[in-house]
């Protein structure tokens, strides 16, 4: 995987830059809004994100499954943005309609706040489909720039609003929605995706194929975000504000792991199915090592800085991060498993693990939130994520013939990893007093 080093480094830089700006933005929001205000903003964004994640019809999974047929690649590319805008518009309209229906129930945000958030859904859908194609085309530098400029635009808007005294729940939501337009503009202008007349027949076939996977995709999203809806309904915006900040900080642990998964995605589609299984196992072993290092670093860093940065009102966030990080890292390290199962075009083995984990998550949240609030929510999430990965590992082993122990790094691999980390630290003079 030596040829992956330049794109890995660039994507890592892009994700790190995005992360820094995201943290800066979250500090600005936390200092301007109390936990209740952050909870209201995040619920509006969560509704829009739900429209994206439940309404995308799993087209990006269908794109991945069809990419191995080289004759379809050009049309899949040209279809990505128009299809995303069309599907996204339908999803946004449906989300606003449901928002109207549930006004006054379950602490649902104001309808105009929901309309503002959902205005970003069509562009967000175009970004979702377009980014997947960009990565499949091995143009990781474009995906990185799109990610970086989007975060920069959102962060700049929040800083300007803060300086001018215009920062409010509505302007925070508006900045979030507008950031998708920046990302989509970069993807198209920089050649990540091609804008030309779409192939309507293939677009229809892609949607139909995606629907075969969509129950699993919907369950996977609800696995990640149903906890926010349940926490909002059972505990209220204050707990949502603290919990969602913890989720944002816990996801720092995904940085290196997600980047490595993105830049190695094309490797899983280069060879025969048998070779792909071996490559997948090698990728996962390295991602486990990255994940453990990232988890420890994240928990220690958050414990040290959360109160000075965000204020005493968010002090409980550090405890929630410690409960969330193991599940978040495990979920990220398992991404190559999903890609392998998608390549095998076995919709059942993609759908069933997500549905099972969702049932576990909802059941545990319903039981634990009334007793333990946000802490119970974090515990339920980590247990559910673990159950998802366990099922995916079982299906991978059955499909490929590779045992689950082969997905764990060996002692020699761990030694090489730690030696390399120490060498890099010495080069940076880390840990020296002078």
Predicted regions and their residues:
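Interfacial transmembrane-helix starts/ends
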Residues: 5, 72-86, 207, 275-301, ...
């Amino acid at each position: 995987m030596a040829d992956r080093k330049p794109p890995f480094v660039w994507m890592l830089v892009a994700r790190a830059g995005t992360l820094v700006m995201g943290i800066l933005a979250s500090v600005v929001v936390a200092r301007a809004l109390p936990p209740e205000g952050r909870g209201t903003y995040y619920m509006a964004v969560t509704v829009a994100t739900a429209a994206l994640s439940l309404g995308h019809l799993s087209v990006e999974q269908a794109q991945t499954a069809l990419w191995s047929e080289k004759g379809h690649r050009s049309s899949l590319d040209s279809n990505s943005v128009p299809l995303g805008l069309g599907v996204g518009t339908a999803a946004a309209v449906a989300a606003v309609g449901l928002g109207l229906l549930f006004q006054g129930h379950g602490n649902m945000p104001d309808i105009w706040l929901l309309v503002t958030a959902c205005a970003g859904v069509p562009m967000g859908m175009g970004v979702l489909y377009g980014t997947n194609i960009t990565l499949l085309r091995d143009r990781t530098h474009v995906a990185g720039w799109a990610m970086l400029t989007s975060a920069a635009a959102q962060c700049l808007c929040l800083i300007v609003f803060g300086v001018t005294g215009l920062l409010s729940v509505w302007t925070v939501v508006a900045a979030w929605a507008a950031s998708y337009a920046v990302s989509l503009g970069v993807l198209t202008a920089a050649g990540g995706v091609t804008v030309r007349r779409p192939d309507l027949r293939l677009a229809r076939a892609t949607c139909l194929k995606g629907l075969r996977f969509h129950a699993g995709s919907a369950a996977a999203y609800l696995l990640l975000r149903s906890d926010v809806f349940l926490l909002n309904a059972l505990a209220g915006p204050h707990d949502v504000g603290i919990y969602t900040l913890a989720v944002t900080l816990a996801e720092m642990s995904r940085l290196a792991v997600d980047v490595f998964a993105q830049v190695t995605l094309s490797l899983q589609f280069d060879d025969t199915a048998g070779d792909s299984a071996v490559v997948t196992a090698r990728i996962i072993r390295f991602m486990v090592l990255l994940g453990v290092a990232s988890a420890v670093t994240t928990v220690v860093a958050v414990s040290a800085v959360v109160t000075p940065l965000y204020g005493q009102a968010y002090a409980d966030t550090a405890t929630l991060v410690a409960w969330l990080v193991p599940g978040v890292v495990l979920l990220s390290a398992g991404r190559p498993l999903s890609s392998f199962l998608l390549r095998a075009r076995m919709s059942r083995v993609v759908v069933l693990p997500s549905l099972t984990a969702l049932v576990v998550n909802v059941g545990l949240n319903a039981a634990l939130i009334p007793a333990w609030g946000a802490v119970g929510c974090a515990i339920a999430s980590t247990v559910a994520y673990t159950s998802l990965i366990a099922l995916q590992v079982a299906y991978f082993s059955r499909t490929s013939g590779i045992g689950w122990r082969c997905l764990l790094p060996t002692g020699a691999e761990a030694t090489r990893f730690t030696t390399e980390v120490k060498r890099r630290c010495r080069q940076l003079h880390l840990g020296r007093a002078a």
